[in-house]
């Protein structure tokens, strides 16, 4: 591990030197490329330097403890050494995590899809709750939400919503949200006061760049129609809604939220590109499926990942046996505790495999 860290530190110093050279400063494309590489190494090199400094301090303290005759000073050193050892072990663990191969999609924006599952109108109302939860979380993170397509029910629930969460690192935090989310509560439509169980499915796709997924226009069938609102009534007399079918894969994307057919087509292609990227990555990772299953869920949309229990005011994530008794604040978008716990668990699983 130390050899690898020494090599990264050397590379970082080399990049620092290059970034100050006139020939690099005058070439914006090269400067940006080198600056990005420099920034990517910054955290791990800073931590490694702290680790080396701490290691030297620990060795010095051990030597002084052997040589020192003053009892009071010896006691101070004896108290300090375990603290330094604990901090060194903690930094070593953090460095091991930083050395793990990064998910190339982690820094990307995401396209999220929420669909009401079993439970009729109640499931659609819950899908709306999930969308509000993610919207508030995104707002807290400083990310932007852009709705691509929405289908409402008669009482204002959401049958299906597709939206972009635009912000650096969105995928690294939201990728663990893929799966089935279950709700247990007394529906507003229930007169008998009985608790019902409903579900909604969430899919999280890293946004794909045009250069990553080339789409042949000849592979597309594009249909246009009038957009509709709650209950199916027409809300637009012009044919602005767009349905794109990717014939080779059978993937279908609809978009009707914009008044312009051109804008709806552009949004639908954006979603289609992300779905095709996911299909390509699923094929590529097929051999690794067993490994992924042993980690924090598989990202499988059919996997039940979390339950929101209203009578008990709790949220339970079934992948890591985490239960929080603050349902209301979670639905207000305060997801950081759950997401951080999932990331930590995932990293620990990956470290086990490396070991």
From Swiss-Prot:
It comes from the Bacteria. Belongs to the prokaryotic/mitochondrial release factor family. GO terms for cellular component: cytoplasm. It is found in: Cytoplasm. The gene is prfA. The keyword Protein biosynthesis applies. Pfam families: PCRF, RF-1. This is Peptide chain release factor 1. It comes from Syntrophomonas wolfei subsp. wolfei (strain DSM 2245B / Goettingen). Peptide chain release factor 1 directs the termination of translation in response to the peptide chain termination codons UAG and UAA. Transmembrane segments: none annotated. Signal peptide: none annotated. Methylated by PrmC. Methylation increases the termination efficiency of RF1. Keywords: Cytoplasm, Methylation, Protein biosynthesis. GO terms for molecular function: translation release factor activity, codon specific. The modification N5-methylglutamine is found at residue 233. Its main location: cytoplasm.
């Amino acid at each position: 591990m130390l050899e690898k860290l020494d090599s990264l530190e050397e590379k970082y110093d080399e990049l620092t030197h290059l970034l100050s050279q006139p020939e690099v400063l005058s070439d914006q494309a090269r400067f940006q490329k080198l600056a990005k590489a420099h920034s990517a190494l910054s955290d791990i090199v800073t931590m490694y330097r702290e680790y080396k400094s701490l290691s030297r301090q620990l060795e010095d303290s051990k030597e002084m403890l052997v040589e020192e005759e003053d009892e009071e000073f010896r006691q101070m050193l004896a108290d300090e050494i375990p603290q330094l050892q604990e901090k060194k072990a903690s930094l070593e663990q953090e460095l091991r995590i930083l050395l793990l191969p990064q998910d190339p999609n982690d820094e990307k924006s995401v396209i999220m899809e929420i669909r009401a599952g079993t439970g009729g109108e109640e499931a659609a109302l819950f899908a709306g709750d999930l969308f509000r939860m993610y919207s508030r979380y995104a707002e807290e993170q400083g990310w932007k939400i852009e709705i691509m397509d929405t289908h409402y029910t008669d009482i204002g629930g959401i049958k299906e919503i597709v939206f972009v969460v635009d912000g650096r690192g969105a995928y690294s935090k939201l990728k663990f949200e893929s799966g089935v989310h279950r709700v247990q509560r007394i529906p507003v439509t229930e007169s008998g006061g009985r608790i019902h169980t409903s579900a909604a499915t969430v899919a999280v796709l890293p946004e794909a760049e045009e250069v990553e997924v080339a789409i042949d226009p000849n592979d597309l069938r594009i249909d246009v129609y009038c957009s509709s609102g709650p209950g199916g009534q027409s809300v637009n007399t012009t044919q602005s809604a767009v349905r794109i079918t990717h014939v080779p894969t059978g993937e279908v994307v609809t978009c009707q939220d914009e008044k312009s057919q051109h804008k709806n087509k552009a949004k639908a292609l954006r979603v289609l590109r992300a779905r095709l990227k996911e299909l390509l990555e699923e094929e590529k990772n097929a051999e690794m499926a067993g490994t992924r299953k042993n980690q924090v869920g598989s990202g499988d949309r059919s996997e039940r990942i979390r339950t929101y229990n209203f009578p008990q005011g709790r949220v339970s994530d079934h992948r890591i046996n985490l239960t929080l008794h603050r349902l209301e604040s979670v639905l207000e978008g305060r997801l950081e505790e759950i997401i951080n716990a999932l990331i930590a668990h995932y990293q620990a699983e990956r470290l086990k495999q490396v070991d």
